[in-house]
Amino acid sequence: MENFTITIAKSGHKTLHYNIGGTTIRIHSAYDPIKEALRIADQCNPKRASIIIVCGLGLGYHIQALKSKFPTHTIIVIEKDKMLAERVRQEFPEVISLASIVHDEEQIATALETIDIRSFKGTALLVHRPSYSLHPEFYDTMTASLHKQISSRISDLLTRFEFEELWVKNILLNSKLMHTTLPVQSLFGKFKGMPGIIVSAGPSLIQSLDALAQAYDKALIVCVDTAYKVLERHNIKPHIVMTLDAQTHSIKHFLGITHKPLLLADVVSSPKVTRLIKNKIFSTTAKYYTAPDGSIKRESTPLMEWIQNFTGQIGDIQSGGSVATSAFDLLLNAGCSSIVLVGQDLAYTGREIHSRGTHHNDDWLPATNRFKNLDTINQNVIRKRKIKYVPSNNGSTVITDFVLDLYRSWFEDSAKKVSIPVYNTTQGGAVIANTTFVPLQALVEKWKKPTVSPQEILSYELSHHNTIHTQSLFRKLSSIHHKLKELQAVAAQDTAHLYALLDDEDMDTLCSPFMRKTLFYIARHNLDQQKIDALIKDAAQAAARQLLKIFAKLEESLI
């Protein structure tokens, strides 16, 4: 703000100048900044866009003009100078209430969390030229980041559309197993002062197996499901195997195993997996973010907020989209003194996709012949990816792709934010900034055995801690079961009765995931009431049919 000067324009309104090297740049008109702002707003034509992105705040005159002209639009203002924004907050508080003002990528994420992405219809960009001219690279970078984050939110929404019904189905079927299952919350804070190891299925995992075997009594070893077969084939036991995948193919990670591990499964995980493993822990995925007012907000997996009203808290784990990222948050919650990444190549080290010994290799072996071996199959897969070269831990470069590089960015960002050291022991894999590269053997040799071993802590919790309480949940589900039958019976004939049933909070919670696409379509189109009623009836009947099929499998548990 030291380079900015506020003066009075000829119209009597405040105006703003930027002084640099003896040169004065006018941020607003020296004659009438209000009229100037109206002209700027007139140049903006968002068409169908629902969000207007503005580069440059100034004193906010153009923001007021925009909001007056487009009152239903969301406005996000990118501003480089935090002190200027604070001055506007003090002198023009009404401007601050009209838009979200962001200075960095983290604040972009916070601003987007307050927007219902389901109503998103595109963005329009308005560049406040005087502000932009001061820091063009900053505004270009921030605009690109904002668009990237919006794309990510849309991708999340599409994922939800694709998998939400499956998630709800799996949650309900897994609820049958909850009364014999430990909530992950019981492990939080129980491993203080102990290192935590995340074992992933990258190609370099095979090089760390000897050291990993020596770490069993010294560190909490959490293995992602993809890597478990590799460890078992080398007689290495992790303390916990973690799975998140809702799809049935995830059972391939466990077919043919001789030792059933302690399974930590997200409640959306495939019931085929959770039924296969006797000793298990359930967790739920949730996302925490800071709202513009500074409060912490929580966004949970569909249905789980409602479920936990009856079962009590199961325990949240935040995820960056992969099992390894969830394991990272688990170790933080467990209280580990450091986090060690093993097999986290985030690259095609040695031009391989996974470590040898995963189910992927098992699937490919029958397809090999003297003309096509595993190396050829790996190469064919890699060629289909959008690849790039990144620095490797061995001093050279290594091939990665767009998705793996996104995960690398996640680990780099997370390692920077946590207060404990993060070690990358992955030889040959991608360099992960904000972590320290150390061979696993060197770490294991330095560690001392704790007084109480990781396995002893887990054994105690499994034998002494209460499992998840489900009696109240199944009493409620039994009541809903009758309402679903009623819904199916009246949906086609009695519109008023149909809407009354759907207005019930419990029914809405269960039916909405199965009606989401229809509700989204209705929200985005200007339909007459008759058409809306017809769509709602069809969607409600389909939801009732699907839920009743699920409830039939829960029949014995219903009270």
Residues covered by each model-derived region:
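Polyanion-binding loop/helix "lid" in catalytic or ligand-binding cores
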Residues: G320-A324, F371-G428
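Glycine-rich phosphate/pyrophosphate-binding loops
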Residues: A227-Y228, N235-D245, L331-S355
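Acidic, Ser/Thr-rich peripheral helices and adjacent loops at domain boundaries
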Residues: S97-A99, M242-A246, L255-K260, S283-T284, ...
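Conserved acidic E/D residue at the C-terminus of a beta-strand in Rossmann-like folds
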Residues: I76-K82, D225, M242-D245
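Long, compositionally biased charged/polar accessory segments in the mid-to-C-terminal portions
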Residues: D405-L406, A415-I559
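Class I S-adenosylmethionine
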Residues: M1-I51, L59-A65, N170-V184
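Acidic/Gly/His-enriched mid-domain segments of enzyme catalytic cores or analogous surface patches
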Residues: A85-E164, E232-F328, L332-A334, Y521-I559
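SAM cofactor-binding core of SAM-dependent methyltransferases
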Residues: I51-E106
